[in-house]
Amino acid sequence: MEALGMIETRGLVALIEASDAMVKAARVKLVGVKQIGGGLCTAMVRGDVAACKAATDAGAAAAQRIGELVSVHVIPRPHGDLEEVFPIGLKGDSSNL
C-alpha cells in the first residue's frame, strides 16, 4: 500500500508552489487538493514512504519560501477505510478535489 503525504498552507499560491516542488522532488502522484476555508489549502500525494517523505520535505521548504506553511504529515500505511470519508485517492482516484 502506498503512503499518503499531506501539506497544508495558508494561501493557494504557497500550495501550488509546494505541490510543484513535491511532484518534482520524488516519484509521487498528486491525488488531491482541497481548499478548506479561511485561506487554508491542503495537497495530498501518494507514493512509497521514502518518496512521500522526500516530497513533503521539498514541498514544505517551497511553501515556507512563498507563504505560510501550516502543517506537514506522512501516513506510511493509511487504512483503506479512510477513503470512504476523506478524498485521499486510495483506489487510484487521482482527481483533484
From Swiss-Prot:
Show the GO cellular component annotation of the record. ethanolamine degradation polyhedral organelle
Q: Which domain of life is it from?
A: Bacteria
**For this chain's UniProt record, which GO biological process terms are given?**
ethanolamine catabolic process; protein hexamerization
Q: What is this protein called?
A: Bacterial microcompartment shell protein EutM
Which family is this sequence assigned to? Belongs to the bacterial microcompartments protein family.
PANTHER family hit by this protein: BACTERIAL MICROCOMPARTMENT SHELL PROTEIN EUTM (PTHR33941:SF10), PROPANEDIOL UTILIZATION PROTEIN PDUA (PTHR33941)
Q: Which UniProt keywords apply?
A: Bacterial microcompartment
Question: Subcellular localization, per the record?
Answer: Bacterial microcompartment
Instruction: Name the job this protein performs.
Output: Probably a major component of the bacterial microcompartment (BMC) shell dedicated to ethanolamine degradation. Each homohexamer has a central pore with an opening of up to 8.6 Angstroms. A positively-charged funnel leads to the pore from each side of the hexamer; a phosphate or sulfate ion is found in the pore. The pore probably allows metabolite passage into and out of the BMC.
PROSITE patterns with a match to the protein in the record: BMC_1, BMC_2
Q: What's the chief localization of this chain?
A: other
- Pathway participation: Amine and polyamine degradation; ethanolamine degradation
**Domain BMC residue range list:** 3-87
InterPro entries attached here?
Bact_microcomp_CS, BMC_dom, BMC_shell, CcmK-like_sf, CcmK/CsoS1_BMC
Pfam family name, one: BMC
| Record note on quaternary structure | Homohexamer with a central pore of up to 8.6 Angstroms diameter. The hexamers pack into a two-dimensional array. Interacts with EutQ.
Q: Which SMART domains match?
A: BMC (SM00877)
Q: Which Gene3D superfamilies match?
A: 3.30.70.1710
Q: Which GO terms describe its molecular function?
A: identical protein binding; structural molecule activity
